[in-house]
Design a protein with these regions (language model features):
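Transmembrane alpha-helices and adjacent helix-loop boundaries
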Residues: 1-215
Length: 217
């Protein structure tokens, strides 16, 4: 056990050293790569909960990622919202859409669920591409304002790097707490056998919809 903890501490230390390299070198390339890694890790974290722990195959995960991103961009560009207000608002709207879409979709199983979520992703992509000036079409929305911390604008990769990695760490801790909660135990039971979980008085439909909504906040 002590050896296992020792290895974990060494890996954590190695990870911190690796994370410190981009801001210390201030290399634009490594900083931009680090930002993208953190952003995609956030998406993968949610997918891991849905696919890895709940056992639900979703091929439309990127659709909700896009809905959140476009939602906050539209609120700031077209309606001139403060970015710090637009981000949680877009997240809540995306979670609500995930709940509404998940209610009928997660009643499907296997290949049917995979095809339904794949179709959702294709539909959302078409809507964004054909949205004209509202979504910016294939070119995306220009003029998205920077996040501000007081008088400090998060306008470069270094500042964004220092923001996204602590946020990712917080999300990892929240995910661990979720897995240790009653909902997390329900998800693992559904992954092993949804029929057996249902026979043990677990509301499998509610648990699946809840995790789908939570991971898209």
């Amino acid at each position: 056990m002590k050896r296992f903890l020792h290895v974990n501490w060494l890996l954590a230390l190695l990870g911190l050293i690796v994370l410190a390299i981009p801001p210390l070198t201030r290399s634009p390339y490594y900083l931009s790569i680090g930002v993208f890694i953190a952003l995609h890790a956030m998406v993968a974290l949610g997918l891991g909960l849905l696919l890895g722990y709940a056992g639900q195959v979703s091929l439309g995960h990127a659709a909700f990622y896009g809905l959140g991103a476009y939602g906050s961009a539209i609120l700031t560009v077209h309606y001139h919202w403060n970015p710090w207000l637009a981000l949680p608002t877009a997240a809540l709207i995306t979670a609500a859409l995930a709940y509404i879409i998940g209610r009928p979709t997660l009643k499907l199983h296997g290949h049917y669920l995979a095809m339904a979520t794949l179709g959702l992703g294709i539909i959302v992509r078409i809507l964004f591409n054909e949205g004209g000036e509202f979504t910016g079409g294939p070119s995306g929305l220009p003029g998205i304002p920077y996040l501000q911390l007081g008088s400090l604008a998060i306008s470069d990769d270094l500042r964004m790097y220092l923001l996204v990695w602590p946020v990712l760490g917080l999300l990892v801790l929240l995910s661990r707490n979720l897995l240790n909660s009653r909902l997390g135990r329900c998800l693992r039971a559904i992954h092993d056998s949804e029929i057996a979980a249902g026979s043990c008085a677990i509301d499998t439909g509610r648990a699946k919809v809840m995790v789908l909504s939570l991971i898209h906040i």
